Amino acid sequence: MAHVKVKTGEYTIPALTTQDFTFWWGDDYLPAAYFNVSIEPNAEGLGMIPLREERRQLTTIAPNGHRQPQLILTLRNNNHFDVPFFANHILVSV
């Protein structure tokens, strides 16, 4: 049976910028698990241009000796205002 865990973080991308955001699961990551992050803009009541995912990079880190994936998303905000967003992290392991 698969185990699914979800975490949500809140971030903001400034107006008219391209910025890298780095995500990882943390200490309870298990080898051979599936890790991903989805982005959900939270610009309530604003007519907005969608955020663009310019690049997606995946690497492995071991900050305390335990291997875990690290996802680097490059996002572009073409709006003339800052856009807050949720980063929904998912980890699936068996």
Where are these regions (language model features)?
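Conserved aromatic beta-strand anchor motif in extracellular beta-sandwich/beta-rich domains
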Residues: H89-L91
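Extracellular attachment/recognition segments
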Residues: A2-V83, S93
